[in-house]
Every structure is written in structure tokens, then in C-alpha cells.
């Protein structure tokens, strides 16, 4: 008697496979989202850091003021740091980019999933590299959790640093030593 062998999967095998894949997806997908959010925050803070460092360097190199600020038209500074940021020589010291004032560099608009807390005024680096304000630019992801926030610290001497967690509480600190906040 010949036995016929059927190839394929039983309903139970398919259900077990679907259950295992669902469990794996439930573990992997949230982790992937966290990784993506962290990557976006890192990119944004690194771009602002690079722009600030360039602005400070050029101010000292050319012995003139360099302004770093957000702008919607690459001419006028605005207070909304979600717009692209620019750095330019401010030869006449009026805080606006004139036709004879060189645009040194700019960043893209911030990713739509992040928000930023920053000073309402422009950052101005003088010929010695000092800044007009001591501040922290804080960038948060869409969860608004402080332990995910990143910060760019700029002090009056022009020192630029990425915020660190110096007290091991899981939250980076701002220029004053207080925990970064997303609210």
C-alpha cells in the first residue's frame, strides 16, 4: 500500500508561528522607535552644536560679531528655533543679516517630531569668542520625557558643550546644573 505524504503546515503550526512573530514584533517595534527618536535628537543637537562652534570660531577668526539664530528667510532672526538656524557675520551689529553680511552656514528645520526650548533672542559671539548669553538649548522628542532630552550648553565665555548627566539621575543637566525639562 502506498502512503501519500502531504507537504504543508497544519493550522496549529501556523497559529504558533503567528503568535511567535507577534511576540517578537511587540518587543522589537517599541525598541526601534526609541532608537529612531534617539537618532533624531542626536542629529538635531549635533547640527546646532556644529553651527554654534562654527559661529564662535569665525567670530574670533574674523574679529567681528557672528550671530546665530533661527530664521524663516535667512535674513531676519526670529524666536522660533524649530525653523532653520543660520550663522552670519553681523558687521553692522544690528542683529539682521544685511546684503553685505555673509551667511556662514545654516541648518535645516527641526524634525517635526521634536520640540525645542531655547532663548528668544539670537546668540551673538564676539571677537573674543564670548557669547551674549549663557543658555541651554533643550531638544525633546515627541514623548516629552526629560530622560530623553538633549541639550546644548553655551556659556558667556563661548564654551559650547553637550549637556551631560553629572548626578547620575538619568536626566542631563542644563547650564545651571538643573535637570533638563521638556515642559
Predicted regions mapped to residue ranges:
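N-terminal single-pass transmembrane signal-anchor helix
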Residues: 1-33
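N-terminal helix-rich module
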Residues: 2-3, 27-57, 61, 65-183
Amino acid at each position: 500500500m502506498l502512503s501519500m505524504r502531504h507537504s504543508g503546515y497544519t493550522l496549529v503550526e501556523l497559529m504558533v508561528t503567528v503568535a511567535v512573530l507577534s511576540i517578537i514584533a511587540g518587543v522589537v517595534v517599541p525598541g526601534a522607535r526609541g532608537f529612531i527618536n534617539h537618532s533624531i535628537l542626536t542629529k538635531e543637537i549635533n547640527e546646532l552644536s556644529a553651527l554654534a562652534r562654527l559661529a564662535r570660531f569665525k567670530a574670533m577668526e574674523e574679529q567681528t560679531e557672528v550671530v546665530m539664530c533661527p530664521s524663516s528667510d535667512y535674513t531676519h532672526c526670529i524666536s522660533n528655533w524649530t525653523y532653520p538656524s543660520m550663522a552670519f557675520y553681523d558687521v553692522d551689529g544690528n542683529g539682521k543679516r544685511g546684503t553685505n553680511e555673509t551667511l556662514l552656514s545654516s541648518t535645516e528645520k527641526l524634525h517635526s517630531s521634536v520640540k525645542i526650548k531655547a532663548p528668544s533672542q539670537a546668540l551673538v559671539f564676539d571677537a573674543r569668542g564670548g557669547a551674549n548669553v549663557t543658555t541651554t538649548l533643550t531638544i525633546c522628542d515627541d514623548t516629552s520625557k526629560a530622560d530623553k532630552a538633549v541639550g546644548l550648553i553655551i556659556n558667556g565665555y563661548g564654551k559650547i558643550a553637550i549637556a551631560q548627566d553629572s548626578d547620575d539621575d538619568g536626566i542631563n543637566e542644563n547650564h545651571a546644573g538643573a535637570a533638563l525639562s521638556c515642559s
